Amino acid sequence: MQNILKKILLTLLLTQVIAAAHAARVELRWYGHSAFKITTPSGKVLLIDPWITNPANKHGQEDLSGIGKADLILISHGHFDHIGDSVAIAKKTGARLVATFDLGKALTHYGGYPLEQSGMDTLGNFGGELTLLEGEVKIAFIPAVHSSTVTKPQDTQDIRDGGNPGGFLITIKNGPAIYHAGDTDLFSDMSLINKFHKVNIMLVPIGGHFTMGPERAAEAVRLVNPEIVIPMHFGTFPILNGTPESLEKALKVIRSRTRVIPLSVGESIEL
C-alpha cells in the first residue's frame, strides 16, 4: 500500500514539474520611449503608453500595423508622447482604457478615445487597484511627479486638463509585478511601493530634461528595490540624453544589487 501511495505522489509531483516547465511565461516588449507591450501567460495583451511610431522606432508603422490584439491600453498621463497611437489601436482592437478617472474622461471627451471602451471598471485613482481580465491582472495607480494635459488630435492649441500624472504597478497572476513609473522625478514615497507588494521589474525614465536623469533614477531604484530595472524614456530626442550606461554606473556607486537590463527598441524578453 505504501509503495502505491509513493508512486501516486511521485506521479503527481512529476506532473506538476512538467506542467511548470511548459507553463506560458510573461513577455515584455519595448517599442522605444515609454511604450511597452505585456503578454500574459493566458495570451492577454496590455499596452502601456503606446507611442509605437515614436522617432526611436524605425519599424514603428510596421509594428503599429502588426498589432492585431490588445485587451487593455494603460496611459500614464495626457502628453502626446504617451497617448501616442492609443486611439488608433483602440478603434482597431476594442481595447479598454486604463487611466486615472480625470484622464480617462479627458481622453474620451477630447482625445478621441472610444467612449464605450472606457468605464468605471477600468478607471481609477491613486491608492486604488483594479482587478481585470478575469482576475489575471491587478493594476494599482501610483503617483508621479510630472504634469498632464490633453490636446485634441486636430488642434494642439486646445489644451485640456488631464488630471494628475501617474504610473502603474501591474501584478500578473503566476507572473511578475511590473512597475511602470510613467514620466516622473524622484520622490521619497517611492519607498512605500514595495511595502505593499514586492516589485520584480521597474521600468524607469532616465532621459532627463522632462524626467529624472540617470543619477536620480538610480536613487529611485534604490527606494523601490526591484530585482530588475529596465530604462526607458531616453534617446527619443537629442535632449533626452541620459543613457543606460550612466544608470548602471550610478547604481554601482550606491551599491545597488538591482540588475539593469537595457532593451533595444523592438526587443522582447520573457519573464
Question: Locations of the language-model features?
Answer:
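Zn-dependent metallo-beta-lactamase
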Residues: 2-45, 52-54, 140-142, 265
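Beta-strand-turn-beta hairpins that frame and shape the catalytic cleft
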Residues: 23-26, 40-46, 129-140, 171-178, ...
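Pre-active-site segment of Zn-dependent metallo-hydrolases
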Residues: 41-91, 105, 115-117, 147-162, ...
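Active-site neighborhood of phospho(di)ester-bond hydrolases with catalytic His/Asp-centered motifs
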Residues: 48-49, 70-78, 98-101, 178-182, ...
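Active-site environment of divalent metal-dependent phosphoester hydrolases
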Residues: 54-55, 80-84, 104-107, 128-131, ...
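Local beta-strand N-terminus motif with an aromatic residue
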Residues: 70, 94-95, 199, 226
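Binuclear metal-ion centers of metallo-dependent hydrolases, dominated by the metallo-beta-lactamase
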Residues: 97, 108-132, 218, 222-271
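Active-site-proximal loop/helix segments of hydrolase catalytic cores
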Residues: 150-223
